[in-house]
């Protein structure tokens, strides 16, 4: 990692550690996801890297490169200095209608571009929406670990996403249109920005996953009396929260909805956005690595050299994790089961959900 120097840790998760780093030559700050080599380099990692690399849009975090160290695979991305949209809402309680629209317009433009590129995100939520550090923050979609490409992958049928944001058809465990499920998740994000709470949680029992799922399936929500929003806004939300995805408003229809078009920034108009939709997208690529080079690096990362268990990045793991890796039996072929299926099963069983933290 001679190219970058560590600044500080900025997050962690099941994948490992996210670090803020600085390019030694250009002094540019970047975000680096550090994933331990070995079994953690799974299909989700492949999917995240390949799908993310193909996207070039101002409302999507820029993918830069992947680097292999003796102990970790490093995914280098644009750093968003403004942090998560989730934290901004937690600090403010909720947004005004105009501010919520400002961020929703950017979210829709970013997701619409993903859909144009035949990629559905499948895990849209406030924690996966970042902001840059400008006075009028630019929204940036991140984390494509659960994304799916209709070009590279089959149509999704597995349940995936954070429970509060999951569309009814996803919970049905049947084949569904990932793009329409993304529209639902965008609607949840809009609701939370306006209300400061999740639309389908039981106010008296917000951590009860089963109740949340029941309310999602029956589309049971309401706008509280203390939240004053326009009739057009309420109508848009109602058109998003439709149980039958075939009757749900589409991304194209959202972009022509009167509420969406009000005060639409010039750079988000159809004319300005057209450049990102051309086959010869003139937006410069932020990665010099070819897909073949990237996949070769990722494939190599699936092995953990025994001679390289310690070193510069060893603090991102632990001795116990290393012991686990050594004792781990060969993975069963049943790993073919989609990771998303496992995730929803766990959610149903555990009842864990980060929902109450937004309550006012």
Curated annotation (Swiss-Prot):
<protein>
    <recommendedName>
        <fullName>Serine/threonine-protein kinase SAPK4</fullName>
        <ecNumber>2.7.11.1</ecNumber>
    </recommendedName>
</protein>
<dbReference type="GO" id="GO:0009738">
    <property type="term" value="P:abscisic acid-activated signaling pathway"/>
</dbReference>
<keyword id="KW-0067">ATP-binding</keyword>
<keyword id="KW-0346">Stress response</keyword>
<feature type="domain" description="Protein kinase">
    <location>
        <begin position="4"/>
        <end position="260"/>
    </location>
</feature>
<dbReference type="GO" id="GO:0106310">
    <property type="term" value="F:protein serine kinase activity"/>
</dbReference>
<feature type="binding site">
    <location>
        <position position="33"/>
    </location>
    <ligand>
        <name>ATP</name>
    </ligand>
</feature>
<feature type="compositionally biased region" description="Acidic residues">
    <location>
        <begin position="317"/>
        <end position="339"/>
    </location>
</feature>
<feature type="binding site">
    <location>
        <begin position="10"/>
        <end position="18"/>
    </location>
    <ligand>
        <name>ATP</name>
    </ligand>
</feature>
<dbReference type="InterPro" id="IPR000719">
    <property type="entry name" value="Prot_kinase_dom"/>
</dbReference>
<dbReference type="GO" id="GO:0005524">
    <property type="term" value="F:ATP binding"/>
</dbReference>
<feature type="compositionally biased region" description="Basic and acidic residues">
    <location>
        <begin position="340"/>
        <end position="351"/>
    </location>
</feature>
<dbReference type="InterPro" id="IPR011009">
    <property type="entry name" value="Kinase-like_dom_sf"/>
</dbReference>
<dbReference type="InterPro" id="IPR017441">
    <property type="entry name" value="Protein_kinase_ATP_BS"/>
</dbReference>
<comment type="similarity">
    <text>Belongs to the protein kinase superfamily. Ser/Thr protein kinase family.</text>
</comment>
<dbReference type="GO" id="GO:0005634">
    <property type="term" value="C:nucleus"/>
</dbReference>
<dbReference type="GO" id="GO:0005737">
    <property type="term" value="C:cytoplasm"/>
</dbReference>
<keyword id="KW-0808">Transferase</keyword>
<keyword id="KW-0938">Abscisic acid signaling pathway</keyword>
<feature type="active site" description="Proton acceptor">
    <location>
        <position position="123"/>
    </location>
</feature>
<keyword id="KW-0723">Serine/threonine-protein kinase</keyword>
<comment type="function">
    <text>May play a role in signal transduction of hyperosmotic response.</text>
</comment>
<dbReference type="Pfam" id="PF00069">
    <property type="entry name" value="Pkinase"/>
</dbReference>
<keyword id="KW-0418">Kinase</keyword>
<keyword id="KW-0547">Nucleotide-binding</keyword>
<feature type="region of interest" description="Disordered">
    <location>
        <begin position="303"/>
        <end position="360"/>
    </location>
</feature>
<dbReference type="InterPro" id="IPR008271">
    <property type="entry name" value="Ser/Thr_kinase_AS"/>
</dbReference>
<dbReference type="GO" id="GO:0004674">
    <property type="term" value="F:protein serine/threonine kinase activity"/>
</dbReference>
<keyword id="KW-0597">Phosphoprotein</keyword>
